Amino acid sequence: MDGKTYKLRASCNACNESKVRCSQTKPTCARCERNKTTCVYGLSRRTHKDAPPISLSHSHSHSHSGSQPHSHSGSRRSSVHIPNATATANATTTANYTSTTTPFMPLHENSMTSYPPQPSVDQFFAQQQPHHQQPSTAGPGPGILSPANLDLPSFMTPLPTPNEDHTNSLFSSFGNFAAGVGGVNGSVNNILTPLTGSPGTGTSASTSTDMFQQPQVQECTCHAGVMEQMASMSQPSRNEERRLSLDVQLSQLKRCIIASEASMGCGHHGNGDSEPINIISVAMLIGRIIDEFELMLNERIGRGTTMPERERSLSLDEATISIREPRLCWGVLELEDDDEVELRQRLYLLYFRKLERLLSQLNVFVRTLHDSRGGSCNPTFIMACEYIHLWLEKKAEGVKRLFPAADEYTGRIPS
């Protein structure tokens, strides 16, 4: 037009016609002319920055473009200074157009969902800033979508980055929650905190000690020996091939008697509101003791042994002594075999007398239970204890008949 070469647009905004020539007198591309379509944006906005917006009608655009045919050079020279009304309209048009095509709108939507940190947003705009600094062909003026014009903090509120303060606040919140649970249970702080009287713990050493004192008062080990002895008297010992020697058997019977006496003499029976179930375990252990005596007597003396057959039982005991069991001795005194057999039989009788005394203690315990706890204790339980004691006495009397007349020398065995 005035001897200068103008750059060509990439395409027409109305029909995507390539290489639309910038012409002040002919602002229509060839395709729009063939299709008889209004081509308002045929002019390049690099040299025709005051072109009418798309919202204006075609008549207004022609009148606006026709009113300035002779002042094209002046408008081109003063294209930097755009009137306020036209600049406002162009900014509105550009904002409406970029609302559907600009890639920056999904940016704040993604930020609301994935919460990117602020430095990544600045880095993204720093990469896009050279494109905005150049004259744009899709909007009026540079820097419309620059970070300076976009008020990102107004519509983007990212979550705080997990730093040290955030972590401390998180654990402090958890501590408050644990403190609240401790207030409900009343013992969490005492369990998690050492039992000291330091300030700030909320408890004192005496309070914590009182809390754990109650289970210690109720603990009782008087009945543990009964259960231990019942477990030690295993069934395989009844086999003759695996029978224990005399000293081991008598030691085991002695421990059982001591454990039963300790259980019946226990004073931790409570306030009388429950039955002493331990007496059933004691009765079971006494029954096992009687069975052991019966096995020993049947093995060494023989069932139904009478006085004329005593010599035969002594010979059997001599063979047993020489094979399996240790010999009895008293210092430098050497015992004969028959003397040793007599001493062994008296040891049997001695421990059996201890068993009889244990049965007498059981009888006293049951009578005391009947007299002192008759009102609070279950009568059925008391009756069961009485029947168990009666059965044990009858069983012990049957075992006592297996002994030979050991009291023919002395009327009683000294205790």
UniProtKB/Swiss-Prot annotation:
Gene3D superfamilies: Zn(2)-C6 fungal-type DNA-binding domain. Disruption phenotype: Leads to complete abolishment of the production of flavoglaucin and its congeners. One of its GO terms (cellular component) is nucleus. InterPro entries: OAF3, Zn2-C6_fun-type_DNA-bd_sf, Zn2Cys6_DnaBD. It is found in: Nucleus. Residues 80-102, 123-135 have a biased composition (Low complexity). GO terms for molecular function: DNA binding; DNA-binding transcription factor activity, RNA polymerase II-specific; zinc ion binding. Residues 50-153 are annotated as: Disordered. CDD domains: GAL4 (cd00067). Pfam families: Zn_clus. Residues 12-39 bind DNA. Keywords: DNA-binding, Nucleus, Transcription, Transcription regulation, Zinc. Its main location: nucleus. This is Transcriptional regulator fogI.
